């Protein structure tokens, strides 16, 4: 039975500590939309998305009113378009992205993910066509997000794909240069990508998923920060327990909202992603949680240990609260979307190298990082390769969302607004890795991939 104290505590979390449900994401299988005629395939895609997701936004708003919990985003993920459009007789898949954009606008969601390809072991003809279409697709749409998986622990790293994505990211930045290269903010390169991730820009509906499903992403850095503040001076055991109990409460809310949405929409409930997702709002920062633990500034020595403790405690609390935890489920550290991260980068405490180290113990890693516009594609590819290596060796998801900001240099800023925020342009190493990334082929899977 709920106590009055628990009710008051929940109200405080929402009103004073920025607790919200970050996203309700409907995953939709588009495999039955395949058709050799590209126009027919696009029509099937539009019709299916608008039919299944037509009430998604309305349902989310009903749940907000019913429970008094803000649901910030209602989103859609679909089967990777490289799979759906494989049989189509067309050389350019950008029209499929525009169809997704139209469908997303029709149902009122702010993002739709799934303009994606899975190429960790090699390319199909459709994969080539989709990847070549990414810059145009992201430059001519507002709501479409794209992702490419280039590595897995079982397959190793497809360095041909890594090298190619360096050029694709660069071209995407150039085509959206008039908007601070925002196209790159909607493009993620993954290793060990999850198939049930509700968060953008990396969401897609995996081939092992059901016909339609509801996945939920929670938030709550502000709630965790205030809990950590109450444990000032306590030892690490007490600190971890404090975070764990708070994560339990946050995840319970996510599960309640997810199951309610699934029931109202008549589709299965999938997972709760328990990632701590920051926003640019004051007090809604993962970096500030780490600083409340005793760091003068996020990025200083000790940051990796603090983030490891935070991430582990969140997972333990979340796993106790729900039997269906999935997606990325860790702490996000997107520089442009976290006010504390931005301050740390401005102060010189948080560097690209430190963010790479933090990848080892958090959810994604190099996320929403602006780099100089003249950064060579080979350097971008090398950064992707470093992140992918961390992922495959440690059997975890890693990802890169870099913005080579056209016309900008280190110390300048890019401004995206909204949840994407603003970011200082961070310097990269001036030395070339071109000869290395141009070798091609696959970096073999690590020995710890042999688990049978």
UniProtKB/Swiss-Prot annotation:
Q: Where is the signal peptide?
A: none
Entry's InterPro entries?
UPF0210 (IPR007841)
At the top level, the lineage of the source is Bacteria
Q: Which Gene3D superfamilies match?
A: 3.20.70.20
Which Pfam families does the record associate with it? Answer: DUF711
Which protein family is it in? Belongs to the UPF0210 family.
- Which HAMAP family does its entry note? UPF0210
- SUBUNIT field: Homodimer.
Protein's recorded name = UPF0210 protein PTH_0987
